[in-house]
């Protein structure tokens, strides 16, 4: 999907229309987990082995990482080391293309900021999940009054930064939790 929707369209004239250069596609080794360190070795579309640190990061102002696993954390470190801006997007399909990527991110950022300000300083939050059988499960997350963070999807200006797409989330790192959560994830 990334090849069709991004690489081919960029190569078929979108780069020229935008007044940009680049638009190449590279593959890197799967990390098999979100936000894990990425191996330095990568490959171009002809299969030539390259180095992310030597051949990719220093050569581009903007990097879009479309992958199976989130690369936001490792690329945030690399963007500060090498001075690029970019976005990560794990999981790409028609639903995301036609919804989460088809919105005005200035409005998304504004809405997320309102929620972030309202939730900053909260000691705890409680979330109720109603299941298909009308049973309600409650999870309580303890936040210790921390400042809420937001994923706004924007990287304006020249400051090295990585956005996570699609965006609009407001999030915390809970210090503890109690209750029931209806989904289970592997470690």
Q: How would you label these PLM feature ranges?
A:
Residues 1-180:
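Active-site bordering "gate/hinge" segments
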